[in-house]
């Protein structure tokens, strides 16, 4: 995978993540992100992605896009939990790597933005044939990257320290008491699947794909440029 193919891979993920119709990044959300993104890869990029995938994925990137979530419970990968998010001081309208990118033990560089940079560089350096004493696990790098690009576009994975990314904001979702983070992660997609797509994930994916090429086609440039700079304050007691 050359640099141009790598850029195609990243752009495919980013293109999908600007879509307004996808709101939650649970297992189904991550599956949809990767399934749709695959369609925007060049043949060369897709070939190299499949080459890196573990055999059990059977050539399907979407099959491993929740791998990073499942991995966190493993003792050898507890450190990776902090890579799924980054929190800023409450009501700050900016992100500073030196201030915000760390885990609960104040280890620097452990946050989602640093993880995306790190695993992108691992993949890029390998395919640029840059000599390094470190032998990277490129399969893990690909699976981490495909997951973390999804996570960073879930708004509450880039949230405030005070409410732990919305986990402390209690809400009601169709009469079910939960927290705002969980609503964004899974419940919005779950509700949409049942209400509009008869619990058929492939049907929902197809609908989004059709909208990308049809209804939303002329809106892409607007998604890439956010001109409104507003500070939004969460309401600790909300009814949805």
Predicted regions and their residues:
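N-terminal, motif-rich segments that launch catalysis or mediate targeting to/interaction with membranes
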Residues: 2-8, 17-148, 155-240
């Amino acid at each position: 995978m050359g640099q141009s193919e790598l850029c195609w891979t990243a752009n495919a993920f980013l293109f999908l993540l600007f879509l307004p119709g996808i709101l939650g990044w649970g297992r189904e959300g991550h599956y949809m992100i990767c399934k749709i993104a695959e369609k925007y890869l060049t043949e060369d990029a897709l070939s190299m992605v499949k080459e890196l995938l573990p055999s059990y994925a059977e050539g399907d990137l979407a099959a491993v896009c929740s791998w990073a979530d499942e991995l966190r419970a493993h003792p050898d990968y507890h450190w990776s939990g902090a890579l799924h998010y980054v929190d800023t001081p409450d009501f700050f309208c900016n992100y500073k790597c030196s201030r915000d990118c760390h885990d609960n033990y104040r280890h620097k560089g452990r946050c989602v933005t640093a993880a995306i940079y790190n695993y992108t560089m691992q993949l890029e350096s390998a395919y640029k044939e840059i000599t390094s004493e470190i032998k990277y696990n490129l399969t893990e790098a690909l699976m981490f990257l495909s997951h973390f690009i999804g996570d960073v576009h879930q708004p509450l994975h880039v949230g405030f320290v005070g409410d732990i990314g919305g986990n402390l904001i209690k809400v009601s979702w169709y009469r079910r008491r939960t927290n705002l983070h969980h609503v964004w992660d899974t419940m919005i997609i779950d509700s949409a699947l049942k209400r509009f797509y008869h619990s058929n994930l492939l049907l929902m994916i197809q609908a989004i794909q059709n909208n990308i090429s049809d209804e939303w086609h002329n809106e892409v440039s607007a998604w890439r440029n956010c001109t409104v700079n507003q500070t939004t304050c969460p309401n600790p007691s909300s009814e949805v």
